[in-house]
Amino acid sequence: MADILRKIEAYKREEIAAAKQALPLAEQAARARDAAPIRGFAAALRSKHAAGQFALIAEVKKASPSKGLIRADFDPPTLAKAYEDGGAACLSVLTDRPSFQGAPEFLTAARAATNLPALRKDFMFEPYQVFEARAWGADAILIIMASVSDDEAINLSETAGELGMDILLEVHDEAELERALKLPSPLIGINNRNLRTFETTLETSERLAPLVPEDRVIVGESGIFTHADCLRLKKVGISTFLVGESLMRQNDVEAATRSLLGLQRNIEAVS
């Protein structure tokens, strides 16, 4: 996986350099500061918890490196609205093109179709990308601790903080968790996918969750397919989940979202 991350970083650095040539940092930062007002990402998750519900970060995801094309009829606004109607708290939208067939316009369009906060799901290395994310409408960013140094994580975190954005810190093991807990973000994502084998097991969340202080919000990532999986993770204090592929493969995304969350469809009285 280290080799894969190095390849990803290499093409990302090239992307960033090209983007800076097309739109210098100062101009990108200005666009970020003129973007639509922030929607509170962490606040939306906590609001669901306060109502006694699971909080879902629903992912708009066309493809992945390991699975290839996930959804052929891919329309981000329609999918985002289905997630919102199904009870999701927030959106996660892939913007990485080479590995996930993502795009900035997917993020902008998905967010515009709903009232939900949105996270830019990408491999983040430089503050320039944070300004990009905000300019495109993102309310939060992802920092994958396995792919950045401590200094890079701090720089990304500080830039996001200056823009009022929330940050999801993704970890895969104890060492990454220890590093993430030194950063101020309350959102700790535990990815259940093994970076070496690509296998997923909820035991990763069950092992790491007890190590996370109670004032942080733990987000379970990968390997979550059913309401039973949500209930299993609730036993170790996880009530927030990031789910993409399993929902993207369903014909009725709204119904699948409700089923995952254990919500019943609202039935309006007919007078």
Swiss-Prot record:
Q: What is this protein called?
A: Indole-3-glycerol phosphate synthase
Give the source species.
Answer: Chelativorans sp. (strain BNC1)
For this protein, the record's InterPro entries field holds: Aldolase_TIM (IPR013785), Indole-3-glycerol_P_synth (IPR045186), Indole-3-glycerol_P_synth_dom (IPR013798), Indole-3-GlycerolPSynthase_CS (IPR001468), RibuloseP-bd_barrel (IPR011060)
EC identifiers of the protein? 4.1.1.48
Regarding protein family, the annotation reads: Belongs to the TrpC family.
- Please give one Gene Ontology molecular function term for this protein: indole-3-glycerol-phosphate synthase activity
Protein encoded by which gene: trpC
Q: Which cysteines are joined by disulfide bonds?
A: none
CDD domains for this protein: IGPS
Its pathway? Amino-acid biosynthesis; L-tryptophan biosynthesis; L-tryptophan from chorismate: step 4/5
